[in-house]
């Protein structure tokens, strides 16, 4: 594997609206991020990925962009952005922005021009079709529910495609003018000093044309747009062109949001000269999710299910490229709630989860608040929810026959707003996030779970994350933890998540994800205990006895 500057880095994702509010308007902002750079550096973060801060009506929290060259005034100014890039650079940190180019906002100038003249230049920037017999061109269902077709404003005989929200019209990537506009913008931002991009929903840019129906998969007579993506061919032409024209010349770090990639395509996506530097491992986030909706999905994974997912990805990727490992992000419930059952949730199991994912082969991502174990919000009413996807899933559950309480429980378990509640900085008013009224409710547990209290507690989850980042960066272990091989260890032993990382050193990572102790045989002599989430360790010549929820990293002779 050709070595790149980002391979040994730790990435921290910031959802700016909920990170830190510097001016008391209830919305996090760029100056707020700048004020916390030293905290992030101390945590061990090298790269900061910002969710969208472009000018936007925020129909989908900034993933509907009205101007790719402007900062939304709610987040600050372009001068603030320049200062953030400069201040990060002083600390040897890099900034990634979200690249959202499957679609734009319906308030973008391109779409406004398309409304004025659907048959003109900008009409071809989108997928605009004539209505025929009052029927849509196809029966695809959008990711946020309902058909993907919407009437073009002022043109009752025409409709446009949106695979997400109706305020997010899809860009026509078949049009080379669209692609050149996208590439021009990417280069503009790279010239400003970005380290690269996280690339949103990019797998959707290639549609299977002409538009056609699929068998309905729900009672609404529609079929998930994902069904079309399974058959769409030729996306590599677009992604390869973008990499050649925009990413390679700048040695940019890029992370693709890619779902359902085929095993024989991994090399194309993240191998040598791949479309992206990396892509996320979504196997565990998708596991147990039902096509019928959240109400029919598993609210949390068992240890064996989680192990099966992460091990499958590690084996599949191998030495082909660098996967990006996550346990949560802005679109998912909180990791400690999704990967640890309620009865197993305790300080040690939270550290175990952190350690198990963080030391896998690949690039570790930390989402804001994850480092202190922020939890899902216990929503008591849909009035507390802002997320458009959650509102749709609530209605899906009701239509399926769920009671209002059952539908709300499903929303609480999976809502994207779980990860979007304000960061809990302290036990002060509004969790120290803002002097004003926060745009989204603060989790009531902020007095027990907050950064300020964990900063001074050497046994806190935050302190454990610092130990993890320090271990990964330690000169004597970095080579092994970044480039060393991965292999499952005692894979059949129930509720044991264990693997080796072998290279210059031989490391054994062990996690006992159960309330009972269990014995684990050792591969050879233990040279050193590198990390332990408990004070004691019980090792004999041939085995180790792991206490309930114990996580330990050993350097072994073999």
List PLM regions with ranges.
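C-terminal beta-strand-rich structural cap/linker in extracellular carbohydrate-active enzymes
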Residues: 540-558
